[in-house]
């Protein structure tokens, strides 16, 4: 932070004021969680209701799933009223039994068994790393359709400098992850803050002047970004070494359940929703196959921003109605 504001003491003061305001902001009670209809290894399949074919949303392992169900900006609750029964895979907290599960292992041991409890294959929608994982689940377990939202696949599409920075962070954290069995959330925060340090400074500078609903929305979003469980050691190793460093998915070498996972092998329609201004998951890292919707919103703003319903929710619902009708 100081390196970004060293030449501007007034800016530093605004940023610090924004941080203080965020820390002292009142928090509303979170909405009640949707009921769990199946559980496995600490993860739960949650039912948000709605009539029609099942659509299962798969969030990232890295942050809580609440970004998909954030107050009056809830994609899940909105879609439940539009001809779909909406389900969420809530990863929960990784207990010791999950410390040895790779990213692909979470697909094999958790996603596929939970999907098997449904009466028929669902539509799948995956956000961020959840989209990468949903692609494996769609190929191995079957799906009516697959929509990915800001999901990385071609990890060589991340700038070289960022991949090198993440490799260095993993090297510095690997011993701790091996000893604890998990990579703490704090280490993950450092990794992803480093992808866009200027934004981290700018958002608190701007928050210093926000009031009312805008300020409350900022607090809710930041609480989500700063919350979440650790990630198991094996999943962290695969994420940093096999994905960011070696790009096994993008080079056609990522195996889950002994099978190569490849977009060309998907048994269903595919939609990739990407943002051309996403600094966390650049659009150049997305799959190239399937249909594509491009937005000019941030990694999170595309899902919950003021234009999200118009630019993402409605186009997603329309696509589902076309390729996977009720």
Placement of each model-derived feature along the sequence:
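Alpha/beta-hydrolase-fold enzymes
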Residues: 1, 119, 133-231
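Short, surface-exposed "cap/lid" segments of acyl-processing enzymes
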Residues: 30-95
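Short beta-strand immediately N-terminal to the catalytic nucleophile in serine-hydrolase-like folds
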Residues: 124-126, 149, 273
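Gly/Ala-rich beta-loop-alpha elbow adjacent to hydrolase catalytic centers
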Residues: 125-134
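Short beta-strand/loop motif that positions the catalytic acidic residue
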Residues: 266, 272-274, 278
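Conserved loop-alpha-helix segment in the C-terminal half of the alpha/beta-hydrolase fold
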Residues: 276-293
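Catalytic histidine-centered segment of alpha/beta-hydrolase-like enzymes
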Residues: 280-283, 297-311
């Amino acid at each position: 932070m100081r390196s970004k504001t060293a030449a501007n003491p007034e800016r530093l003061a605004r940023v610090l004021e924004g941080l203080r305001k965020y820390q002292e902001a009142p928090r509303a009670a979170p909405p009640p969680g949707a009921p769990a209809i199946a559980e496995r290894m600490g993860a739960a399949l949650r039912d948000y209701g709605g009539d029609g074919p099942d659509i299962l949303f798969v969030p990232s392992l890295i942050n809580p799933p609440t970004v998909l169900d954030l107050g009056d900006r809830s994609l899940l609750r909105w879609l439940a009223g539009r001809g779909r029964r909406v389900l969420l895979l809530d990863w929960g907290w990784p207990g010791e039994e999950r410390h040895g599960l790779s990213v692909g292992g979470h697909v094999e041991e958790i996603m596929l068994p939970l999907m098997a409890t449904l009466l028929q294959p669902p539509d799948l929608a995956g956000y961020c790393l959840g989209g990468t994982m949903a692609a494996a689940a769609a190929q191995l377990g079957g799906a009516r359709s697959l929509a990915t939202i800001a999901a990385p696949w071609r990890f060589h599409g991340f700038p070289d400098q960022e991949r090198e920075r993440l490799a260095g962070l993993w090297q510095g954290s690997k011993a701790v992850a091996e000893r604890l069995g998990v990579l703490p959330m704090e280490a993950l925060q450092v990794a992803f803050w480093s992808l866009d340090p200027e934004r981290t400074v700018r958002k608190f500078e701007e928050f210093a002047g926000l009031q009312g609903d805008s300020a409350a929305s900022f607090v809710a979003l930041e609480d989500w970004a700063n919350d979440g469980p650790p990630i198991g050691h094996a999943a962290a190793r695969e994420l940093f070494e096999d994905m960011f460093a070696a790009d096994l998915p993008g080079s056609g070498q990522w195996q889950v359940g002994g099978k190569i996972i490849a977009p060309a092998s998907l048994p269903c329609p595919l939609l990739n929703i990407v943002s051309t201004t996403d600094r966390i998951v650049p659009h150049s890292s997305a799959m190239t196959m399937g249909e594509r919707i491009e937005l000019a919103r941030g990694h999170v703003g595309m899902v919950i921003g003021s234009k999200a319903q118009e630019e993402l929710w409605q186009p997603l619902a329309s696509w589902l109605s076309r390729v996977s009708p009720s």
